């Protein structure tokens, strides 16, 4: 029998020399200027940086929502940026969950339906999707909200529902863009505790772009984006 060393496990996500340039009518800017990084399984990683430094751009490229100008992103060993739009979208739906600052819940659907939505998009029957969504809601202690609509939720509740929706497919990777950006300290702590629980229960890897330094300090590792480059923080 071959004993696998923990160091033999490949990273869940690798960025290799990512460059991203935006071209405007008479000039261009280089937002990311050669980002190389590896993210290990089961970690909670923070990406911090000044406003406009490129955190969201990097997260979008990591999730296949945007393509780099050059360089590669490998998700579980597959070059995401080289996949066709169709294959990239399949990989996104199966392997990545997304959480946004303003949660992006669908206003005309109940909490339960919002959480079930990624499964319905995948083609699961409503009864099965509903059952799974109920299970997740119970697991994270939000079952009392299942019939409410997004306009009937507080900011913290909305964000926890968005977390539930991001993990319903049990993706190995969740990318979160300012997940606590519009929340007060107590709600922000609650959302982070939820991410920590999910990380422990399922081994989900989280990459969080944030301005919130106290949240970043609770993560396993902090990267700083500055002048298009990335460095590991020693804070
Ligand atoms: N689709 C786009 N087209 C052109 N320029 C863009 C686009 N998206 C972002 N930018 C520019 O790229 C730079 C980085 O933006 P990005 O949103 O990644 O920064 P950020 O660090 O996430 O900022 P914030 O913390 O304010 O959300 C900014 O100068 C922004 O204006």
Swiss-Prot record:
Keywords recorded for this protein, A-Z: ATP-binding, Cell inner membrane, Cell membrane, Membrane, Nucleotide-binding, Translocase, Transport
Keyword Transmembrane helix in record: no
PROSITE patterns hit by this protein: ABC_TRANSPORTER_1 (PS00211), ABC_TRANSPORTER_2 (PS50893), LOLD (PS51244)
Example GO molecular function: ATP binding
Ranges of residues in domain ABC transporter: 13-235
Localization annotation: Cell inner membrane
Task of the protein: Part of the ABC transporter complex LolCDE involved in the translocation of mature outer membrane-directed lipoproteins, from the inner membrane to the periplasmic chaperone, LolA. Responsible for the formation of the LolA-lipoprotein complex in an ATP-dependent manner.
Subunit structure: The complex is composed of two ATP-binding proteins (LolD) and two transmembrane proteins (LolC and LolE).
Top-level EC class: translocase
Signal peptide: none
EC numbers for this chain: 7.6.2.-
Assigned protein family: Belongs to the ABC transporter superfamily. Lipoprotein translocase (TC 3.A.1.125) family.
Organism, as annotated: Blochmanniella floridana
Superkingdom, taxonomy of origin: Bacteria
Gene3D superfamilies linked to this entry: P-loop containing nucleotide triphosphate hydrolases (3.40.50.300)
UniProt-annotated binding residues for ATP: 49-56
Pfam families given in the database record: ABC_tran
Recorded topology in the membrane: Peripheral membrane protein
PANTHER family: ALPHA-D-RIBOSE 1-METHYLPHOSPHONATE 5-TRIPHOSPHATE SYNTHASE SUBUNIT PHNL, LIPOPROTEIN-RELEASING SYSTEM ATP-BINDING PROTEIN LOLD
GO cellular component: plasma membrane
Protein name: Lipoprotein-releasing system ATP-binding protein LolD
């Amino acid at each position: 029998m071959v004993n696998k060393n923990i160091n033999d496990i490949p990273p869940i996500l690798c960025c290799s020399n990512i460059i991203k340039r935006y071209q405007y009518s008479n000039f261009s800017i280089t937002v990311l200027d050669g980002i190389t990084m590896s993210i290990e399984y089961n970690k909670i990683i923070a990406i911090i940086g000044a406003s406009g430094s490129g955190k969201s751009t990097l997260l979008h490229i990591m999730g296949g929502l945007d393509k780099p100008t050059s360089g590669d992103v490998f998700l579980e060993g597959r070059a995401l940026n080289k996949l066709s739009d169709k294959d990239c979208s399949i990989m996104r739906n199966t392997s990545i969950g997304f959480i946004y600052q303003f949660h992006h819940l669908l206003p005309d659907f109940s909490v339960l339906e919002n959480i079930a939505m990624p499964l319905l998009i995948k083609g699961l029957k409503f009864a099965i999707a509903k059952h799974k969504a109920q299970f997740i809601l119970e697991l994270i202690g939000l079952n009392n909200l299942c019939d409410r609509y997004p306009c009937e939720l507080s900011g913290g509740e909305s964000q926890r529902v968005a977390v539930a929706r991001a993990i319903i497919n049990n993706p190995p990777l969740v990318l979160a863009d300012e997940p606590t950006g519009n929340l007060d300290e107590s709600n922000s702590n609650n959302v982070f505790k939820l991410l920590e629980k999910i990380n422990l229960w399922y081994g989900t890897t989280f990459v969080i772009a944030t301005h919130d330094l106290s949240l970043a300090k609770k993560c396993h590792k902090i990267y700083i984006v500055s002048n298009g480059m990335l460095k590991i923080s020693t804070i």
